């Protein structure tokens, strides 16, 4: 599960949300990024995977227009690799990085197999992530059609 918080407003997927337990929300599919980030300086907190507590601070620092034929959203820059799914949150990821630094660590071999031989925590590829985003967009369309 994930959610966006902008001030007192919570934006989430109502199919995965229990309002009785977690309070009222704005339905994520009823709000566009442009409706939330209306001016430079608007900030939000994005929480991914409630169990692991990945908190991301998002802030609109600039607005620009893009040609209409351009596929959006568009990744223009980034830093470092994404932590592997289900690595145990920030603390689990720190432990994983420590294991990978030490080939003599008892968990090194198993961890290397899990993350893959090409995993590099300092690498970021705009092209690779743009392709992944395209795959995610396709998956999300299929997911929405299933409900």
State where each predicted segment sits.
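Short linear regulatory motifs enriched in tryptophan with gly/pro/ser
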Residues: 1-147
